[in-house]
Amino acid sequence: MSTSAAPTPLESRASGPLSGTIRVPGDKSISHRALILGALSVGGTRISGLLEGEDVLNTAKSMRTLGAKVERTGEFAWTVNGVGVGGFAQPAATLDFGNSGTGCRLVMGAVAGCPISAVFDGDASLRSRPMRRILDPLALMGAKVTASAEGGKLPLTLQGASNPVPIEYRTPVASAQIKSAVLLAGLAAPGVTTVIEQEASRDHTELMLKHFGAEIVTTPEGSHGRRIALTGQPELRGAPVIVPADPSSAAFPLVAALIVDGSDLVLSDVMTNPLRTGLFTTLREMGASIEEDDVRGDAGEPMARLRVRASKLKGVEVPPERAPSMIDEYLVLAVAAAYAEGTTIMRGLHELRVKESDRLEATAAMLRVNGVKVEITGDDLIVEGRGHVPGGGLVATHMDHRIAMSALVMGLASDKPVTVDDTAFIATSFPDFIPLMRKAGADFA
């Protein structure tokens, strides 16, 4: 099981204007998928811009344990020589994913289609998170959990199917992790595996499967949903992948630039996939100055340069159907809402309760301890913005990287400094967050 070092607290203080040009790390979702699909392909895959955070490095390690050759060839440059669909070897060691729910759940899907048995584990936070929603459809395809902690949680042993069965599966919630696990298992099944979702979730797996040569067709389902049909047993071919900057990581310097007076900050190569840009849409509705140029793409994923300038924000209502496109960004959106004038209502946030922490309660606690009026009603978060934040609070991060970064952003414009109890877990997704923000003008001490 993963362990962490002693806590490393940090104080964030009111800063002068943020400026310059920065590139946030490569997208975490793309990085995980590039490693996994590279490992399931025949031949070599070259990846540039890979996120070298702990979560992704644990996925790289798991691919090595399962028989793929994974090497770092330069800064953020990696090669993967795969074993082909269904070719994973029996692992000699536990697959430890640390804090990464995405890596763990996607690899469960990939393992489910192979006739091997693997032990999955993670840190205390990941051990507390639900896995049943992933394991249920994989069981329909022939995989079996032969041992697990109470409630199907980690650590658990997954026996992959000798003869995986294609299924048609309707996801109970909008979840790219559930969808992706089923599709990755479906690669090894004969015939067509279909996933139906009522609300479209991020489509990185579908786009990358096409990039590696899979036959996959996506059609509309209802007013907001999608039907994804994958033809199994393809021969995936290694392909080059350029990883764009992660919009979920870009969210932190972006919101910081909006709330710190006089800021004018440029973020380069940010992914602008429409299923990941709910935060940008919401902030623009609040009055944010966010401009895009240098628009281009790779492997089906669009990216652009963003110019962000300090803005006077107003409260808005965020509809629940927007949640899948910004599920990881509500924490830092709540910070923006605290600096806005008026009330912001974020609806339908039930999925925040089963992230690295109960992010709904943790977000409310982060705001309250710093003098912001906030209320949770059911699955809705209501923030009363007053144009400024008193600050002065100590924020409990609960081993959650996004809580830590959101609180540090909040302190950059608050009346009194904001302190986080531990910054260690920031390394899971954004290892250079603190030096990169300092370079732009942030005052962390």
Curated annotation (Swiss-Prot):
3-phosphoshikimate binds at residues 28-29, 33, 175, 177, 328, 355. It holds the Pfam family EPSP_synthase. Its EC number is 2.5.1.19. The active site is at residue 328. GO terms for cellular component: cytoplasm. GO terms for biological process: amino acid biosynthetic process; aromatic amino acid family biosynthetic process; chorismate biosynthetic process. It is found in: Cytoplasm. Residues 1-20 are annotated as: Disordered. The keyword Transferase applies. InterPro entries: Enolpyruvate_Tfrase_dom (IPR001986), Enolpyruvate_Tfrase_sf (IPR036968), EPSP_synthase (IPR006264), EPSP_synthase_CS (IPR023193), RNA3'P_cycl/enolpyr_Trfase_a/b (IPR013792). It is an enzyme of class 2 (transferase). It comes from the Bacteria. Keywords: Amino-acid biosynthesis, Aromatic amino acid biosynthesis, Cytoplasm, Transferase. Pathway: Metabolic intermediate biosynthesis; chorismate biosynthesis; chorismate from D-erythrose 4-phosphate and phosphoenolpyruvate: step 6/7. Phosphoenolpyruvate binds at residues 28, 101, 129, 177, 359, 402. The keyword Phosphoprotein does not apply. It catalyses: 3-phosphoshikimate + phosphoenolpyruvate = 5-O-(1-carboxyvinyl)-3-phosphoshikimate + phosphate. Belongs to the EPSP synthase family. PANTHER family: AROM/DEHYDROQUINATE SYNTHASE (PTHR21090), PENTAFUNCTIONAL AROM POLYPEPTIDE (PTHR21090:SF5). Catalyzes the transfer of the enolpyruvyl moiety of phosphoenolpyruvate (PEP) to the 5-hydroxyl of shikimate-3-phosphate (S3P) to produce enolpyruvyl shikimate-3-phosphate and inorganic phosphate. Monomer. HAMAP family: EPSP_synth (MF_00210). This is 3-phosphoshikimate 1-carboxyvinyltransferase.
